[in-house]
Amino acid sequence: MIARTKIICTIGPATNTPEMLEKLLDAGMNVARLNFSHGTHESHGRTIAILKELREKRQVPLAIMLDTKGPEIRLGQVESPIKVKPGDRLTLTSKEILGSKEAGVTLYPSCVFPFVRERAPVLIDDGYIQAVVVNAQEHLIEIEFQNSGEIKSNKSLSIKDIDVALPFMTEKDITDLKFGVEQELDLIAASFVRCNEDIDSMRKVLENFGRPNMPIIAKIENHLGVQNFQEIAKASDGIMIARGDLGIELSIVEVPALQKFMARVSRETGRFCITATQMLESMIRNPLPTRAEVSDVANAIHDGTSAVMLSGETASGTYPIEAVKTMRSIIQETEKSFDYQAFFQLNDKNSALKVSPYLEAIGASGIQIAEKASAKAIIVYTQTGGSPMFLSKYRPYLPIIAVTPNRNVYYRLAVEWGVYPMLTSESNRTVWRHQACVYGVEKGILSNYDKILVFSRGAGMQDTNNLTLTTVNDVLSPSLE
């Protein structure tokens, strides 16, 4: 059974071996996420090499995503996890040290120290550990813990009521982007996006490195990102709803409504949407998810999210393969009750938000024709990815087989809802149609006498303007004679 909603897996110590990565792929991984808040270029380079070798061997459109560290406040390295309980105190310093309970822990960036005030609430590791500032100095602050937990290396930290303007891109981010371009990665996830100018500035950096069209995913993690969301959505290629930091920056009870709002606007503006953070969190330690987690994933799918993301579950968890299999099972079961018609009507109704009226008119008409004719799939030839992306926006029941000669587009489409990318070296319509039908049969999407709708370009045209209703048998029959 196919799964239209895509799965993103964060790669970490639990899964960065060839054997585990292949198991993740078999379980349902569509995108491999590399979190550049952790690791080095050397360690990420090794993982990238394994992923590229794997996707080449298996001939699959596995995308590789670089997730930037961004302008975040984060702890430094600790010698070993520091166990804390209510009333315990810990020193945070601007000095570069290997952290311990006695020596303290480094806090990055150092520019935040002058802005910290006593009695300010502190949240560590997505809010799991809570503390309060009891002493604030120019290069040192002391916090007192309000609950028990473990302080680990590189964990995120949020200080309430702090008014410091951090730069959107750090020197590390720029170095990481250069590395990502050199490694020919497929997607960039930009952390802590606050406005559309942030996206524009990152595009200029990527252009300077020779990759102006590299897709940028805007991670919405703070109140400014929410406030400027519609402009950010238009400026970016996709959206990630980063619920962890969002639930810290804003009230946690606001997150569900914001998730639905952002998923809807992303879809209406033709941008893919990723729902992330704590989706199957308990599976870091347990082989089965909670009922609430299953409902959370299902609700994200019913919201129309393009992809769901696993973080600690696959990066450092005890049951990474089980987590991906569970996610795929939830997707397949939920999509049985997905209201495809309602999503089509909703997207078709919001004509004011259409980015390309021409493409969308062709796409919407084609979907209606295909469904009325009881077709089993849509086949579309694309050089830029535009046509399948606009088709995906309407959330059709029919799988979209996207045929492309562009390797960058092939991998980039891996994150799009309901799109099954196929790489070809052919531009001849007869040949690529034949290849697409063979691919569809091999993947279990099509059978011999199924009807299909083919989108293609007319002679001299740059955009899709031809719709052909045919059958798999008619396309394949020349080779059977």
UniProtKB/Swiss-Prot annotation:
It catalyses: pyruvate + ATP = phosphoenolpyruvate + ADP + H(+). GO terms for molecular function: ATP binding; kinase activity; magnesium ion binding; potassium ion binding; pyruvate kinase activity. Mg(2+) binds at residues 221, 245. Its cofactor is Mg(2+); K(+). The record marks 219 as: Transition state stabilizer. Signal peptide: none annotated. Its EC number is 2.7.1.40. Pathway: Carbohydrate degradation; glycolysis; pyruvate from D-glyceraldehyde 3-phosphate: step 5/5. Substrate binds at residues 33, 244-245, 277. It is an enzyme of class 2 (transferase). ATP binds at residues 35-38, 74, 155. K(+) binds at residues 35, 37, 67-68. Keywords: ATP-binding, Glycolysis, Kinase, Magnesium, Metal-binding, Nucleotide-binding, Potassium, Pyruvate, Transferase. PANTHER family: PYRUVATE KINASE. Homotetramer. Belongs to the pyruvate kinase family. This is Pyruvate kinase. It comes from Chlamydia muridarum (strain MoPn / Nigg). The gene is pyk.
